[in-house]
Amino acid sequence: MKPQKSLRARAMDILSRQELSRIGLKRKLAPHAESEEELENVLNEFAERNWQSDLRYAEAYIRSKSRKHGSLRLKQALAQQGIDEETSRNLLPDRSSEKLAAIAVLRKKFKHPAADLKEKQKQARFLAYRGFDADTVQTALKHAWDENWEDGC
């Protein structure tokens, strides 16, 4: 039988594989903690030593997801992980980048412009589900297949 890992060693193993928010790390460690106090001590130590950073997690998350998802969805996902709204707002991509991402996502999913209203609504729902706001959705639907429109955000 393997010896039990300490909570600190488990946290180190988890963070060596992926960036996590404090809440995410707490969720993973909670079943292995003997007490809430022990868990909080480990989380505080890791935060003080900058081994776990909510800011670093938010940056990595946004960098990996911003090409496929809009600001609304990114903000919601970060809020679920305990990242405060101000940090999220500061890290989110600017409007022009988001519009270009929406166009890229739309072109990848739908190979041609909407032929009728039903198809246009389907495309709009797809972008809204991905977390793009109404203005971005309208811009993407209008300009996704324009050859001349590059960065006219």
UniProtKB/Swiss-Prot annotation:
Keywords on this record?
Cytoplasm
Protein location: Cytoplasm
Q: What's one GO BP annotation on this UniProt entry?
A: regulation of DNA repair
Kindly list the GO CC terms recorded for this protein: cytoplasm
Say which domain of life the source belongs to.
Bacteria
Concerning its family, UniProt says: Belongs to the RecX family.
Q: What function does the entry list?
A: Modulates RecA activity.
Name of the protein this chain belongs to: Regulatory protein RecX
Q: Which organism is it from?
A: Neisseria meningitidis serogroup A / serotype 4A (strain DSM 15465 / Z2491)
